[in-house]
A protein has these predicted regions:
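Membrane topogenic/interface segments and analogous intrinsically disordered interaction regions
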Residues: 1-298
């Protein structure tokens, strides 16, 4: 009788125990994030500009330290992935509205014809993931910064905090540029090229999302260059001297990103990529001047 009562008690209390476990997990996770976030504002114990390569070499000398870094990386990746999945699940409810907006360059969602029965759900999931990534990007960048924080100076950590909104802004600007500037002429060219075609949702949304994503990533270059020059990984003059190679690389990237084969649409991508590169070079010289001044004062 006692065993039956115990089993009955475990059964009726199981939902409450699960809720308690879930709340403890969530609040523990939040507390862990705040503890990691507090490390961004602690004062430095060492010099201001320790070389990154030397710091990496010291970390690799101790195998135990390597495993600690791997465990920390796993923790930050797990949290970032979990937030990405949660936000993507939330945006799934608004995927139909997002699909309608993305279909405007082709004349509306009615212009798309699904061939396979699972095609619609696949498109919904891809659009939800891209939208979720866009909204989760600030937190993903924060997790990257929290992982790198122990090896950064206080000044670098503060710059990382300020850079989080800049990363999001640049990514969104790249996506907006792809949607409003590049996509309309590209769709007109592809739709009217020799043969009349019935466009599938999967093919249309795949190339639209790829175009917007990679343009968004490309627009992060100036900020990335500023960070690398500030950390002493590269020098600004090297970027200026290699500008001819960068122009060729930008042309190759434009050819890979552009969904059409005409030179007009390629130029629509190529010219902004070159402009983004030279903006990065300008920021690199600003970062180089600031770094040289700090080294002279040290």
């Amino acid at each position: 009788m006692r065993k039956r009562l115990a089993a009955f008690w475990r059964t009726i209390t199981a939902p409450f125990r699960f809720i308690f476990w879930l709340l403890r997990l969530i609040f523990g996770w939040i507390a862990d994030i705040f503890r990691d976030f507090a490390t961004l504002f602690k004062k430095d114990d060492e010099g201001e500009d320790a070389p990154v390569i030397d710091a990496l070499g010291k970390a690799l000398e101790n195998p135990y330290s390597v495993f600690e870094h791997l465990n920390a990386l796993r923790k930050h990746l797990f949290r970032a992935t979990l937030v990405l999945l949660v936000i993507s699940a939330i945006t799934f409810a608004y995927a139909e509205n997002i699909l309608s907006i993305l279909a405007q360059p082709i004349g509306g969602i009615d212009q798309l014809i699904a061939v396979e029965i699972t095609e619609s759900i696949g498109v919904f999931m891809r659009v939800s993931m891209l939208t979720g990534f866009t909204f989760a990007l600030p937190y993903i960048v924060l997790e990257i910064l929290l992982f790198a924080a122990p090896g950064l100076t206080r000044r670098e950590r503060m710059f990382g905090v300020v850079a989080i909104p800049l990363v999001v802004i640049l990514f969104v600007v790249g996506m907006v540029f792809a949607y409003f500037i590049l996509l309309p002429p590209a769709v007109v060219f592809l739709k009217n090229f020799i043969f009349e075609n019935n466009t599938r949702p999967e093919s249309y949304y795949s190339f639209v999302m790829a175009l917007m994503f990679w343009l968004g990533v490309s627009f992060e270059f100036p900020l990335l260059v500023y960070v690398l020059v500030s950390m002493g990984v590269i020098r600004a003059r090297v970027l200026l001297e290699q500008s001819r190679i960068a122009i060729v690389v930008a042309a190759l990237l434009a050819a890979a990103i552009t969904p059409t084969i005409d030179i007009f649409n390629m130029l629509l991508v190529w010219i902004p990529l070159i402009a983004v590169y030279y903006v990065g070079v300008g920021l690199a010289f600003i970062a180089q001047r600031g770094r040289d001044r700090r080294l002279r004062q040290a």
